[in-house]
Amino acid sequence: MNLISIPAFQDNYIWVLADDKDRCVIVDPGEAAPVLKAIEENGWQPEAILLTHHHNDHVGGVPALCAKFPHLEVYGPQETQNKGTTCVVDEGQNVLILEWEFSVFATPGHTSGHICFYSSPYLFCGDTMFSGGCGRLFEGTPEQMYQSFQKINALPEETIICCAHEYTLANMKFAASILPEDRAIQDYYHKVKELRAKNLSTLPVILKNEREINLFLRTDDIDLINKINQETKLQQPEQRFAWLRSKKDNF
């Protein structure tokens, strides 16, 4: 199988999984034009669309794609039912498309009904996790997002995380400001700066690496706890997660 990212808008990525027969699955098509262009250039035959949440920069291209390819099944959470979804899915369900079986995880936080799709080794996480960071909490709570991160962190370390936005540079600048002495964070921040200076993508990423550089996965890390303790005493990892999210919101 082939994993392809299609840039959209200013910093979105629309993900495509294609098999050796050029059949493909499209994830979070926020706009149709770049997807239709890629379909024509690669000779793909779209079979299905996966939606992680209802925001327009993830669903805006669905009507045009379904008009062009009327056979498309569109899988998404309840909150996308009025965005073109033909099959509503939720936590614990499995979706079989071609040779891929996608497990569905409920990951509330960014939105209340956000979901992720996992088909080893790929995780399509929408706006739940970004490299070095996490999604803004528009509808959910820090506690919900913390639990969503625990689900992702329970996946195998070789999981390939397909985030929906190129936010890595800003996230690593924030992480480096929190733990300026952390070698893994500083090294990755330097690597990301080099990639973005060349206008190269930083995605996808591997869960094993995220565990080292993503502070939102390190809420039990002693260095982070000591940093937070300089300002306030927080006993629970959910509280430290909320502290990080608040700091990032105001960074």
Curated annotation (Swiss-Prot):
Residues engaged in binding Zn(2+) 1: H53, H55, H110, D127
The record's catalysed reaction(s) read: an S-(2-hydroxyacyl)glutathione + H2O = a 2-hydroxy carboxylate + glutathione + H(+)
Q: How is the cofactor bound?
A: Binds 2 Zn(2+) ions per subunit.
Q: What SUPFAM superfamilies does UniProt report for this protein, alphabetically?
A: Metallo-hydrolase/oxidoreductase
GO biological process per UniProt: methylglyoxal catabolic process to D-lactate via S-lactoyl-glutathione
| Signal peptide annotation | none
Q: Which InterPro entries match?
A: Clx_II_MBL, Glyoxalase_II_hydrolase, HAGH_C, Hydroxyacylglutathione_Hdrlase, Metallo-B-lactamas, RibonucZ/Hydroxyglut_hydro
Where does this protein hold Zn(2+) 2? D57, H58, D127, H165
Question: What EC number(s) would the UniProt record show?
Answer: 3.1.2.6
Q: What class of enzyme is it?
A: hydrolase
User: Record keywords: Membrane included?
Assistant: no
Listed A to Z, the keywords are: Hydrolase, Metal-binding, Zinc
Give the pathway listed in the UniProt entry for this protein.
Secondary metabolite metabolism; methylglyoxal degradation; (R)-lactate from methylglyoxal: step 2/2
- Which GO MF term does the entry hold, naming one? metal ion binding
Q: Which Pfam families match?
A: HAGH_C, Lactamase_B
Q: Which cofactor does it need?
A: Zn(2+)
Quaternary structure (record): Monomer.
Stated role:
Thiolesterase that catalyzes the hydrolysis of S-D-lactoyl-glutathione to form glutathione and D-lactic acid.
| Family membership noted in the UniProt record | Belongs to the metallo-beta-lactamase superfamily. Glyoxalase II family.
Q: What is the name listed in the Swiss-Prot or TrEMBL entry for this protein?
A: Hydroxyacylglutathione hydrolase
